[in-house]
Regions:
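Extracytoplasmic and endomembrane cell-envelope/extracellular-matrix remodeling and assembly machinery
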Residues: 28-31, 204, 209, 217-275
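Extracytoplasmic/secreted proteins, especially bacterial periplasmic and envelope-associated proteins
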Residues: 57-64, 68, 115, 125, ...
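C-terminal motif of bacterial Sec signal peptides marking the signal peptidase cleavage site
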Residues: 16-19
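Cleavable N-terminal export/targeting peptides
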Residues: 11-14
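Peri-catalytic and regulatory segments of divalent metal-dependent proteins
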Residues: 21-154, 213-214, 233-240, 272-275
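Bacterial N-terminal signal peptides that target proteins for export
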Residues: 1-9
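Post-HEXXH active-site segment of zinc metalloproteases
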Residues: 146-181
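Metalloprotease/metallohydrolase-associated module, dominated by Zn2+-dependent proteases
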Residues: 171-220
Length: 275
C-alpha cells in the first residue's frame, strides 16, 4: 500500500496521463455495417496495375504532385485555423526520395520533412495515389503529430519512472533499480504509440480534403490503401515486403471505413471540423 506522502507523485502522474496529446478532428467511429462494407472493398475494389517506375524517374514523378498538394495542404491548414507555425512548416517541408529502398513506405520526420521510399513510387498505380500519400504525410506535419508522439513518449517514460520510484519507495532495501529502468522504457514505448491509429485516421481524412482542393480524385486515398493492403499480403508482383506505411496504423477495415466516409463527406460538401 502506498504511503500517504507519496500521494503528490501519484497526482502528478495522473495529470501527465490526462495531458497526453490526442487528435484534434471531430471524427465519428464507423458502424459495424460500414466496417463490413470496407472489408469487402479491400478485396473487390479495382485498382490500376503498378507502374514499376525506374529509380531514374522517381524524383521527377513525385515532383509532379508536390506543388499542387503542398499548396492545397497549406490552404487547408489555414482554413482550419491551425497555428501559423504549423502551416509554415507545410511550406518549408523538404521532400526526399530513397530510391534504393524497396519497401512501400512514406513518413514525416521530426524535422517536418516528408520521405518516400523507392518501393512506394515504383509500385504506385498513378500520380494521384502518390498525391494521396503526400497529402497524408503533410497532414501529419500540419497537426504536429511527430512532436505529439515524442511528447507522449516522454510522458510515458515519466509515468513509468514514477511507478518504479513508487515501488522502490515501498520495497527498499530489496528493490532492483533495473525495474525502474524497465518501467521507464515500457512507459516510453506505450507513450510513443498513444493515439497513433487516431492520428493516422485524422491524416487520412485531412488528406482527402487536400486532394479535392488540389484537383485530384478523393478516391485515390482509398486506392492507395487498397494497394498497400494487397501488397502487404503479397498480392502485387509477388513481392510481399512489410509495409511501413501501415505500421502503428488502424486495422485496414477500420481505416478504409473512415476513408470511404470521408470521401462521401467531401463529395457532399461536409466541411472538415476540429473538435
Amino acid at each position: 500500500m502506498f504511503k500517504s506522502r507519496f500521494l503528490p507523485v501519484l497526482l502528478v502522474i495522473a495529470a501527465l496521463v490526462s495531458g497526453c496529446d490526442a487528435p484534434v478532428l471531430d471524427i465519428s467511429e464507423p458502424s459495424h455495417h460500414e466496417k463490413t462494407s470496407a472489408r469487402r472493398a479491400l478485396d473487390s475494389v479495382s485498382i490500376p496495375p503498378p507502374r514499376r517506375i525506374p529509380a531514374s524517374e522517381m524524383q521527377k514523378t513525385i515532383e509532379r504532385v508536390e506543388g499542387p498538394i503542398r499548396k492545397a495542404a497549406f490552404e487547408v491548414c489555414r482554413e482550419l485555423t491551425l497555428p501559423d507555425v504549423r502551416c509554415q512548416n507545410v511550406l518549408a517541408s523538404d521532400l526526399q526520395v530513397m530510391a534504393t529502398d524497396q519497401d512501400m513506405n512514406a513518413y514525416a520526420d521530426y524535422h517536418n520533412n516528408v520521405g518516400f521510399t523507392g518501393g512506394m513510387i515504383h509500385y504506385s498505380g498513378s500520380d494521384e495515389e502518390l498525391a494521396a500519400v503526400y497529402a497524408h504525410e503533410l497532414a501529419h506535419v500540419m497537426y504536429g503529430h511527430v512532436d505529439k508522439k515524442i511528447n507522449n513518449m516522454l510522458m510515458g517514460m515519466i509515468i513509468g519512472g514514477g511507478i518504479g520510484l513508487a515501488a522502490a519507495y515501498n520495497a527498499d532495501p530489496y528493490y532492483d533499480d533495473r525495474i525502474t529502468y524497465d518501467l521507464m522504457n515500457t512507459g516510453a514505448a506505450i507513450g510513443s504509440v498513444a493515439y497513433s491509429p487516431e492520428m493516422e485516421i485524422e491524416s487520412d481524412r485531412t488528406a482527402i480534403y487536400i486532394l479535392e482542393k488540389a484537383g485530384y480524385s478523393p478516391d485515390s486515398m482509398r486506392d492507395v490503401i487498397v494497394r498497400l493492403h494487397r501488397h502487404q499480403d503479397g498480392a502485387i508482383g509477388g513481392h510481399p515486403n512489410g509495409v511501413g506505411f501501415l505500421q502503428t496504423h488502424p486495422s485496414n477495415d477500420r481505416r478504409i471505413a473512415h476513408i470511404l466516409s470521408s470521401i462521401d463527406d467531401v463529395k457532399s460538401g461536409v466541411p472538415l471540423r476540429l473538435e
